[in-house]
Amino acid sequence: MSGRGKQGGKTRAKAKTRSSRAGLQFPVGRVHRLLRKGNYAERVGAGAPVYLAAVLEYLTAEILELAGNAARDNKKTRIIPRHLQLAVRNDEELNKLLGGVTIAQGGVLPNIQSVLLPKKTESAKSAKSK
């Protein structure tokens, strides 16, 4: 008899997700699965889904921060599609990235052409200067 049956065997370490290893909130494993299933390439490297998840997380955080600011400017505590639209269209780079995207229930940016505004007369200008 060897007597090894009662000794504590090797306990398996707690599983650590690739998202937590990379310090991300977005699911690296799911992104990897979608890259494999999407027929983008025959093979997918180990770093590609981590990088893509990080980029998606950064863009999401950027849009949500700007939308939160837009909601706060409108004295609201909940972000609605209108706030997302205002956030994206008022940011030059995000507007370029999402130029062809329609946000449902987003509305349009308030804009009045300068030629449609009433002309300032001389009497109004002199009254303001006094």
Swiss-Prot record:
The molecular function GO annotations come to: DNA binding; protein heterodimerization activity; structural constituent of chromatin
Coarsely, its chief localization is: nucleus
Sites of the modification N6-(2-hydroxyisobutyryl)lysine? 6, 10, 37, 75-76, 96, 119
| N-acetylserine: residues carrying this PTM | 2
* GO aspect biological process, one term: heterochromatin formation
Biased amino acid composition, Basic residues: 7-19
Q: Mind telling me how this protein is modified after translation? A: Monoubiquitination of Lys-120 (H2AK119Ub) gives a specific tag for epigenetic transcriptional repression. Following DNA double-strand breaks (DSBs), it is ubiquitinated through 'Lys-63' linkage of ubiquitin moieties, leading to the recruitment of repair proteins to sites of DNA damage. H2AK119Ub and ionizing radiation-induced 'Lys-63'-linked ubiquitination are distinct events. Phosphorylation on Ser-2 is enhanced during mitosis. Phosphorylation on Ser-2 directly represses transcription.
Q: Point out residues bearing the modification Phosphoserine.
A: 2
Q: Give the quaternary structure.
A: The nucleosome is a histone octamer containing two molecules each of H2A, H2B, H3 and H4 assembled in one H3-H4 heterotetramer and two H2A-H2B heterodimers. The octamer wraps approximately 147 bp of DNA.
Protein name, entry field: Histone H2A type 1
Organism lineage: Eukaryota, Metazoa, Chordata, Craniata, Vertebrata
The ranges of region (Disordered) come to 1-22
Q: Which residues carry this modification: N6-acetyllysine?
A: 6
- Report the residues modified as N6-glutaryllysine: 96, 119
Q: Where are the N6-lactoyllysine residues found in this chain?
A: 10
